[in-house]
């Protein structure tokens, strides 16, 4: 059954929701795609990536340790871009980052932290420079020290600007 999109008032529109396969075919060779939460369905997603020839355009993310990622995805890591999500408020955050860099060389990390009281995000701007890229998620205020979408709408420099200029973000996940 085909699904229809709804507008901002939750009214059904004539526009259809594409299947993942249709979206992958359309995006082939054009853009990178972050398949959020797709790690839960990795086998099915991987089959579609192979079928559509888009394995090198997909970013899969997760918050597992390097050991668990290697165990779960193994040889797939040679074809699919895997980006670790690291909660900087956890005690072992720096060790987790270094483990991934040493063993997997990820192109980027999604870094999470609740408040600017945490000194680690500022330190990582310099320590990760030239080694990997930094990605921040700005959907909620607890994911990037309150430098989220809402803060950015009020004052760019306190939101996205802070993440880019002060914390070295090269990628920002937003829904605005």
Please state what every model-predicted region is.
Residues 1-87, 103-116, 130, 140:
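Metal-dependent phosphodiesterase/phospholipase catalytic core, i.e.
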Residues 10-13, 85-176:
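C-terminal active-site rim and adjoining tail of enzyme catalytic domains
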């Amino acid at each position: 059954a085909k699904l229809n999109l709804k507008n901002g008032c939750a009214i059904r529109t004539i526009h259809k929701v594409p299947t993942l396969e249709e979206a992958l075919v359309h995006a082939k060779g054009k853009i990178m795609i972050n398949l959020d939460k797709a790690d839960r369905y990795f086998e099915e997603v991987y089959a579609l990536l192979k079928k559509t020839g888009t394995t090198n355009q997909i970013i899969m993310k997760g918050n597992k340790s390097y050991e668990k990622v290697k165990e779960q995805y193994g040889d797939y890591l040679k074809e699919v871009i895997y980006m670790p999500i690291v909660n900087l408020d956890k005690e072992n955050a720096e060790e987790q980052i270094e483990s991934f860099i040493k063993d997997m060389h990820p192109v980027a990390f999604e870094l999470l932290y609740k408040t600017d009281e945490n000194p680690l995000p500022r330190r990582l701007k310099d320590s990760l420079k030239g080694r990997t890229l930094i990605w921040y998620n700005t959907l909620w205020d607890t994911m990037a020290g309150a430098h989220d979408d809402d803060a950015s709408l009020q004052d760019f420099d306190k939101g996205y600007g802070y993440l880019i200029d002060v914390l070295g973000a090269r990628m920002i996940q937003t829904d605005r």
